[in-house]
Every structure is written in structure tokens, then in C-alpha cells.
Amino acid sequence: QRQMCIRDSYQAQRGIPGYRQMKIILERRYGLKCNLKRIYRLMRVLGLRSVCRKKKRRYQKKTPAEYTAENILNREFSSDRQNEKCVADITELKYGSGSKAYLSAVLDLYGRNIVAFSLSRRNNTPLVLDTFEQAFQKYPDAKPLLHSDRGVQYTSRSFRKEMKRAGVCQSMSRVGRCLDNAPMEGFWGILKTEMYYLYHFEDYETLRKTICAYIDFYNNDRYQKKLGCMTPAEFIAASAK
């Protein structure tokens, strides 16, 4: 029975789950208790393994910042309520024959959910402004602490003006300290491992649709151990009761 459940779950999620994620799936969906070593062994017997993560160095052009903020978040990634602390970042993706697209996202540290995201062919301030416009439409009264790196998009005068108007306090990573924004970096790693590296995207629209589908899956169907083996949507709903 366990082997059948493992195989079905693996196929249903396109080979994404490793043995740790599979343990949560077996417990949540099938009520099957099994230790990690046994699941690891069963997956090896079945010839099932998750996609291996590829690591890629990121290089950014240094642009004089119009505004910078202190590292107020200071790696305090726990949160007691929704819309208390959010982190944001941009990552580069490719499609076609090397064309570039840029994905901007905001993650809430309470439910570990993606609040808003935006994809563009240009890595500029309008990209992040569009992302936050979506976030404010969902939560018009939210005034979170917002943490980001010191990219030119987040240090621009126009972005600072918009955050000030919305009553949002900015926090920024120290120079060269990517771990200051570890939850966002972690999300990019998950998205690329479980979605981006699995396919070759022929065009921009295919990339956009696949990202939309994956983030919906991430928010509503992907269990997280840090959330008590619940999905972000389940965790937020449970906390509201």
C-alpha cells in the first residue's frame, strides 16, 4: 500500500517530492505513518528521486542607491500574525533562445505564502511597484515591515515614496549578506527546483502560465514542515479561527 501511495503521489506532483516531502504527503493524505529512512528506502526501490537543485551565482550591477534602510528585520524571520513582516526579491528566468524575464514576489513570513507576484521582460522599478500594487489591493490596510535587498528597484525614490505613502517601513539586507533575506532566497530555490528546471519554456506566455500555476500550487497544496505540515492556505485559515 505504501509503495502504491508513494508512486501515485510522485506521479501526481510530477516527480517533485523528495522523501521528506513524501513523508508529509503520506501522513496528510493517506494517514500512513512511516519514518524517513523507510520512505527513503522505498523510493530508492521504486527508482524515484526528486529533482536535484541547481545552484547558480547571481551577479548584479552596482547602481548608486537613492535611498537605503537599516537591516531592521535582522534575520528575525518568525512572525506572530499575517501582514506583520514581508520579504521581497526579484529573480531572473530564461525562455526561448536565452531571452530573459524577471519575477518579482512578496512573501509573508507568517503563513510563508506568496502574497503577490509579477513577471516582466524588464527588471525595473515598475516591476516591483506592480507587485506591491497587487499586494495592497488584497490587503489595503496592511502596513508590514518590508525587507528586501539593496537592489536599485527597492532603493529608488519612486518606490520609497510609494512605501511611505502606504505606511510601510522598509528594511534592507546588508551588502553581500544574502542570508539576511533567507526565506525569499529559499522560495526561489524551491520554485526553480520544483518547476523552472523541469521544463524548457519556448515563449514568455508559457513561462508566465506555468509560474501562475506553480504559485497557486505552492500556496494551496504544498505542505510545509515549518507550518505544522500544513499548506500556507491551511495555516492562515486555521489561525483565523
Task: Give residue ranges: language-model regions.
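Short, small-residue-biased leader/transition segments that mark boundaries at the very start
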Residues: 1-6
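Conserved, non-catalytic sequence blocks in retroelement Pol enzymes and Pol-derived host proteins
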Residues: 15, 31, 78, 96, ...
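DNA-recognition alpha helix
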Residues: 19-31
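Mobile-element integrase/transposase regions
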Residues: 32-105, 127-130, 138-143
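RNase H-like two-metal-ion nuclease catalytic core shared by retroviral integrases
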Residues: 62-63, 148-150, 156-159, 172-192, ...
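A short acidic/small-residue loop/turn micro-motif
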Residues: 108-109, 119-124
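Hydrophobic "anchor" residues
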Residues: 113-114
